[in-house]
Amino acid sequence: QTTARRVAALWLSLVLVAATGASPVHAERLVTDMAGRTVKVPDKVARVATIGPVPVLNSFVFAMGEAATIANNLPPNLGGSRWRFQYVVAPQIATLPVIQSGEGPSVEGVAQVAPDVVLTMDRPTIDLVERTRTPAIYLAWREPDDVKAAMRLLGALYDRPDAAEAYCRYFDETLAKVSARTDALRDAQRPRVLYANLKNLTQPHRIAEWWIAKAGGKSVTDDGRTSEAFNFSIEQVLHWDPEVIIVSAAHEIADAYADARIAGVSAIKNRRVYAVPMGAHVWGNRTAEQPLTILWAAKAFHPELFKDVAISEEVRAFYANFFKSKLSDNDIDVILEGRAGEH
């Protein structure tokens, strides 16, 4: 815990700036973001704009229980039913302005929503936002544990360190719960796993190499790369012979089973093709829901080891405790079956 406190202090220095006789309404604080920048922010943050990978950033805010503070809608390319749970958790964003397009963020849009702070994972955005005299906080998620540093930074920003620590505790405890059952598995007991877009023949996000391993699997695309995407061929799929295939949406399962090119692959023959869940974001990519990803994958890879784990109840509790959102049974089914984009 001492080490954790030191790390938190390094990333999240939060200093009250006292002004003699100043009204509390105008009080300000200094926050150090994940680029090492010291940023002056209002004492109370009530409105935030998210620019860049908006669903990821929103998921951080959701996990703080602060969905109501988001002041902008999703970009146009992220509209439609696939992102429905962004609107379930933060219904107000449906009628709020869009402040970025495929060409990038809009200075006018930022000025229009008048946020207290802009959250971004894009360094060039910082310079643009500062033209509006709006504080910009940079968050990073390069390595798996960065999500905890990001949450602690938001805990400082919202003056809710307790909420940030609750999330970090859940993250660590969930991983420990899975590891307690999978650490003793021999290599032969860990299934070969391919997480992929089979239409484009890509593995879209490097973080999948981490959660597949944490869940007790062996990612066939894990070659130690540092780039995000991984391209491969059908011949490589046949060579890898994955025992489990994970696709990005429910409708892709039927496509995989119908693809004659991979009919002889173990995952196809044994009917072990699954759609990764989709809630606030795709669970296979970067999202605050990542602990749930690992638990879901562990149960998919090792159903006997995790037969006592009710994933649906984990999802219900996570959304209630962190996102402050009550899900129906149908909502949970849609999330877990990867059907968010299907009508």
Where are these regions (language model features)?
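N-terminal secretory signal peptides that target proteins for export/translocation
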Residues: 1-5
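Bacterial N-terminal signal peptides
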Residues: 8-21
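Bacterial Sec-exported substrate-binding components of ABC uptake systems
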Residues: 19-60, 95, 162-194, 306-343
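A short, structured surface patch at a secondary-structure boundary
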Residues: 50-113, 117, 217-220
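Short beta-strand->loop
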Residues: 72-75, 120-122, 138-143, 157, ...
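Proline-aspartate-enriched helix->loop->beta-strand connector
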Residues: 99-102, 106-120, 134, 233-250
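Structured C-terminal subdomain patch of bacterial secreted/periplasmic proteins
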Residues: 148-165, 183-185, 253-343
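Alpha-helical, coiled-coil/dimerization segments enriched in small aliphatic residues
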Residues: 205-229
